[in-house]
């Protein structure tokens, strides 16, 4: 169902989107990648803090 809707919209719009919005797609991809990297780094730092002894306990 959803795939047919995507195909019906995407196929006629594809040349327009690929030409006009190429820069936007690249920008969105980069933003998504950066956000993913930040989240991954945040998770890693939280995991390190959780595994490290709590402050005040020497």
UniProtKB/Swiss-Prot annotation:
InterPro entries: ATP5MJ. GO terms for biological process: proton motive force-driven ATP synthesis. Keywords: Membrane, Mitochondrion, Transmembrane, Transmembrane helix. It comes from the Eukaryota. It is a single-pass membrane protein. The chain crosses the membrane at residues 22-39. It is found in: Mitochondrion membrane. Pfam families: Mit_proteolip. PANTHER family: ATP SYNTHASE SUBUNIT ATP5MJ, MITOCHONDRIAL (PTHR15233:SF1), MITOCHONDRIAL PROTEOLIPID (PTHR15233). Component of the ATP synthase complex composed at least of ATP5F1A/subunit alpha, ATP5F1B/subunit beta, ATP5MC1/subunit c (homooctomer), MT-ATP6/subunit a, MT-ATP8/subunit 8, ATP5ME/subunit e, ATP5MF/subunit f, ATP5MG/subunit g, ATP5MK/subunit k, ATP5MJ/subunit j, ATP5F1C/subunit gamma, ATP5F1D/subunit delta, ATP5F1E/subunit epsilon, ATP5PF/subunit F6, ATP5PB/subunit b, ATP5PD/subunit d, ATP5PO/subunit OSCP. Belongs to the small mitochondrial proteolipid family. This is ATP synthase F(0) complex subunit j, mitochondrial.
